[in-house]
């Protein structure tokens, strides 16, 4: 049985948890600790994150061997791929249970090792990032958006960011800046996303206004 919930009491007796909260290490650590206070000892803990290193998030866990990344893609009901991320100390039992679960819900798993952004975000995010850099340079947004579609992408780069949510993109960038410090390479897209989300309150599709209005 699969049950979505925000009530920790509902987690008692579960054998697999998939957490999907804000991309903020402190928030995720707090949820991890509160969850593990009520679940059975052998429960596998999956974190749905697109960029935060699993080995880092697992430090908040009571048993790092039971901690694994299970990354779904937006929109979840349409996207078949699920990225399963092995942390430094993730055990084979956690991997087996994650693979079994993903196959049961008829999605396609890929297993990757731990690295910031993993496989999919490191590769795919160049698409909306470079598009937003071009927007900052003054290139017409319609030209950028249509070029992506004409090149064969399912939707344009700005539609992608609205679907994923500008709020999420902003918090990912902030968490990455904090983690990397001086090693973080700021791009023009950071300024654009900050302007849209932090200054104008445009979160994307979730509040019906992002690059587009819905």
Positions of PLM-derived features:
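N-terminal glycine-rich phosphate-binding loop for ADP-containing cofactors
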Residues: 1-214
């Amino acid at each position: 049985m699969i049950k979505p919930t925000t009530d920790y009491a509902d987690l008692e007796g579960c054998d697999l948890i998939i957490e999907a909260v804000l991309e903020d290490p402190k928030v995720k650590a707090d949820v991890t600790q509160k969850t593990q206070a009520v679940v059975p000892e052998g429960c596998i803990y999956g974190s749905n994150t697109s960029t935060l290193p699993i080995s880092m998030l697992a430090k908040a866990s009571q048993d790092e061997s039971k901690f694994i990344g299970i990354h779904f893609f937006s929109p979840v009901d349409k996207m078949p791929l699920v990225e399963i991320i092995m942390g430094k100390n993730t055990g084979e039992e956690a991997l087996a249970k994650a693979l079994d679960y993903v196959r049961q819900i008829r999605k396609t798993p890929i297993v990757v090792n731990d690295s910031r952004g993993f496989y999919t975000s490191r590769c795919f995010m160049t698409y909306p990032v470079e598009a937003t850099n071009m927007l900052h340079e003054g290139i017409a947004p319609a030209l950028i958006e249509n070029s992506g579609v004409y090149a064969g992408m399912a939707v344009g780069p700005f539609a992608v960011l609205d679907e994923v949510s500008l709020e999420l993109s902003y918090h990912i960038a902030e968490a990455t800046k904090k983690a990397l410090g001086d090693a973080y390479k700021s791009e023009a897209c950071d300024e654009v996303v900050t302007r849209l989300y932090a200054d104008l309150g445009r979160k994307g599709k979730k509040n019906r206004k992002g690059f587009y209005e819905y």
